[in-house]
Every structure is written in C-alpha cells, then in structure tokens.
C-alpha cells in the first residue's frame, strides 16, 4: 500500500511517498522490514531514496531524523 504526506523536522519540511506492506519483505525491504520504496523530498529535491535498495543516502541530519520517524511508523 502507498502512503504520502509531509513531515516537519527542524526548519525542514519533507514530502514523502512510501510503499509498505503488512508483512516484512526480507529480500528488498529496508532492513528486511515492510518498506520497499521510500522517497523524501525537500524543496523539490530528493534528500533520500530507497527503491528495493538504497539509491540516495540521507543528505543531512534532518533527513536522517525524518527517515527514522517514517521507519518507526511504516517499517
């Protein structure tokens, strides 16, 4: 299932789009979890991207924090 939304971390507002499943997907989920795809954008630029594998690492601490929040909710 897909989920979209926005999250504020510090002075940054991230738009996210995440594809997640009810059960973990060991082969291509983040850390073997339920998220198979996740994109974080800030000011129209990609700050993190995972598409069945890591494509773009978190660009800074705010991005890492946003990722941790979404991992807790969806993974």
Please annotate each region the language model reported:
Residues 1-24:
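Negatively charged, low-complexity tracts enriched in Asp/Glu with abundant Ser/Thr
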Residues 19, 26-30, 59-62:
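Generic alpha-helix signal with a bias toward terminal, lower-confidence helices
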Residues 25-51:
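Acidic, low-complexity, intrinsically disordered interaction modules
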Residues 42-75:
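Mixed-charge, Lys/Arg-enriched low-complexity segments
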Residues 16, 21, 28, 48-50, ...:
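Sequence-level detector for tyrosine residue identity
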């Amino acid at each position: 299932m897909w989920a979209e939304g926005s999250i504020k971390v510090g002075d940054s507002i991230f738009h996210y789009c995440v594809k997640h499943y009810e059960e973990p997907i060991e082969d291509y989920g983040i850390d073997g979890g339920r998220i198979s795809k996740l994109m974080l954008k800030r000011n129209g630029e990609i700050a993190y991207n995972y598409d069945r594998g890591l494509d773009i690492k978190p660009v800074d601490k705010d991005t890492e924090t946003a990722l941790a929040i979404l991992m807790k909710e969806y993974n």
